[in-house]
């Protein structure tokens, strides 16, 4: 921690929330370029020199202002395109450096607050599959759920105003505004939805930081409402928001709105309210009645519109009963169903049979969407019949089998917690037969002839099921391994949803 403090040299700048001194340090841009999107310097020792370069950023900004493509000749389209791309490159370089810089104060605050605790590096070990054990534990006892689509900001200035709550550095805010409007001006002909997609692809780090800050502003109200009825501070609010640098904003909300919301809070008093979110979709579940959920729905819509200047339509929030509706969440279809069980009780000479039903959280693979994804990736047709993949036919046999096997193992790994695996077996069958047809196409043979010559066992090694993997770790005769074979397994080392488009 001391090395980190000395390395970043924040002292007065950190106390005053000034970031512009970091913008003028050359090693920041080297770190942003070398470490990429998924890496961070906060747990690594970077060997860059601590030197200032006032010229590098000034030169880039000057070139961006000088490259005025509006005064160029309209006939020289190639030159316009080149200069425009070059100007866009300068903007991207500065925005990447800014995205790296703006994360530093909030990440430092996170590390300093967790100093001396055992969960210092826990944020690097989080898994999206840790959500499903939470849902199994909580949602099976609840009645209604709000299916919420978090609205996007209608104007870029809303994102800048969100950052203003945390930093007082006007220079950094102007630079952020400059980067955002530069992207929008260069792509003025595209729609707002296309602009968000374009911006997220060009600078994922800055986009995710702005989007997370935008979403967490919405989520701050949930902590406020949960703390008010119970008059107790939530001990898990840090994990609830996955950020702790929103405490100042939350405390401000409590001070400002406590007197005004006493009547409203009486309607929302519910000790069985649970909230979970992944990306732009969230769920708010309760054990209360449908009337309570209706009040929550319209309260959230009005609160977002009045406090965050975001137009949110009520039709983006759905009220569903968990008993008869499936939730489409993180590529799973989840629902709560009754699991009947019969218990026989023997008392002296008389016996009784008691029928009991227990609510269980059921997760299954969405069959139709998966078939559609496979058809889009050219593994099968729209009816689910496997076909060959011609674009992989030029690869070697081992590379073809390795690609198909990697996809199959990843999907099997991700959907291992599904309670109904029939759809998963069908997906494995599609991949297995598509692999065989691709190999047969390469060797100009039929699938039957190809399998007859090499044997169907040559694919087994690459399509090893999770149960076989467990058998290598746990002894066969152990009761634990037998129970794991029959039950569901959530692998907590998964950090992203497998995307078939990456294998195109």
Curated annotation (Swiss-Prot):
Domain of life of the organism encoding this protein: Eukaryota
InterPro entries according to UniProt: Domain_X, Maturase_MatK, Maturase_MatK_N
Disulfide bonds: none
Alphabetical keyword list: Chloroplast, mRNA processing, Plastid, RNA-binding, tRNA processing
Compartmental location: Plastid, Chloroplast
Primary localisation category: plastid
GO cellular component: chloroplast
A GO MF term: RNA binding
Biological process terms in GO annotation: mRNA processing; RNA splicing; tRNA processing
Function noted in UniProt: Usually encoded in the trnK tRNA gene intron. Probably assists in splicing its own and other chloroplast group II introns.
Similarity comment: family membership: Belongs to the intron maturase 2 family. MatK subfamily.
Name this polypeptide is given: Maturase K
Naturally occurring in which organism (per UniProt): Nepenthes distillatoria (Pitcher plant)
């Amino acid at each position: 921690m001391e090395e980190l403090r000395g390395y970043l040299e924040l002292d007065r700048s950190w106390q005053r929330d000034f970031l512009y001194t970091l913008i003028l340090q050359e090693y920041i841009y080297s770190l942003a370029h070398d470490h990429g999107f998924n890496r961070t310097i906060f747990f690594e020792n970077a060997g860059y020199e601590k030197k200032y370069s006032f010229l590098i950023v000034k030169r880039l900004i000057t070139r961006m202002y000088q490259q005025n493509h509006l005064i160029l000749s309209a006939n020289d389209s190639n030159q316009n395109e080149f200069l425009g791309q070059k100007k866009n490159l300068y903007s991207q370089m500065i925005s990447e450096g800014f995205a790296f810089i703006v994360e530093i104060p909030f990440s430092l605050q996170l590390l300093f607050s967790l100093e001396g605790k055992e969960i210092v590096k826990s944020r690097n070990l989080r898994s999206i599959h840790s959500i499903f054990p939470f849902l199994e534990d909580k949602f099976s006892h609840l009645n209604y759920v709000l299916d919420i689509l978090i609205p996007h900001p209608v104007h870029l200035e809303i994102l800048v105003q969100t950052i203003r709550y945390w930093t007082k550095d006007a220079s950094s805010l102007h630079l952020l505004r400059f980067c955002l409007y530069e992207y929008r001006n260069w792509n003025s002909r595209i729609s707002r939805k296309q602009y968000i997609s374009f911006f997220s692809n060009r600078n994922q780090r800055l986009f995710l930081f702005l989007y997370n800050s935008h979403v967490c502003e919405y989520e701050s109200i949930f902590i406020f409402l949960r703390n008010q009825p119970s008059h107790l501070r939530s001990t898990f609010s840090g994990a609830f928001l996955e950020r702790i640098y929103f405490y100042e904003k939350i405390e401000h909300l409590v001070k400002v709105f406590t007197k005004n919301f006493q009547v409203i809070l009486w309607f929302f008093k519910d000790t069985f309210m649970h909230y979970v979110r992944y990306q732009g979709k969230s769920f708010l579940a309760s054990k209360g009645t449908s009337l309570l959920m209706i009040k929550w729905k319209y309260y959230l819509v009005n609160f977002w519109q009045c406090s965050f200047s975001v137009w949110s339509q009520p039709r983006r929030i759905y009220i569903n009963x968990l008993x008869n509706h499936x939730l489409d969440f993180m590529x799973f279809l989840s629902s709560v169903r009754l699991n009947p069980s019969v218990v026989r009780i023997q008392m002296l000479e008389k016996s009784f049979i008691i029928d009991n039903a227990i609510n269980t959280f059921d997760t299954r693979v969405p069959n139709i969407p998966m078939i559609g994804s496979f058809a889009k990736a050219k593994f099968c047709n729209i009816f689910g019949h496997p076909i060959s993949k011609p674009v992989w036919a030029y690869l070697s046999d081992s590379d073809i089998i390795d690609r198909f096997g990697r996809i199959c193992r990843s999907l099997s790994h991700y959907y291992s917690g599904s309670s109904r695996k029939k759809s998963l077996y069908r997906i494995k069958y599609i991949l297995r037969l598509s692999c065989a047809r691709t190999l047969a196409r390469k060797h100009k043979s039929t699938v039957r002839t190809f399998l007859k010559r090499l044997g169907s066992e040559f694919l087994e090694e690459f399509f090893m099921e999770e149960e076989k993997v467990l058998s290598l770790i746990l002894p066969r005769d152990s009761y634990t391994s037998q129970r794991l074979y029959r039950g569901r397994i959530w692998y907590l080392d998964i950090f992203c949803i497998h995307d078939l488009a990456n294998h195109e």
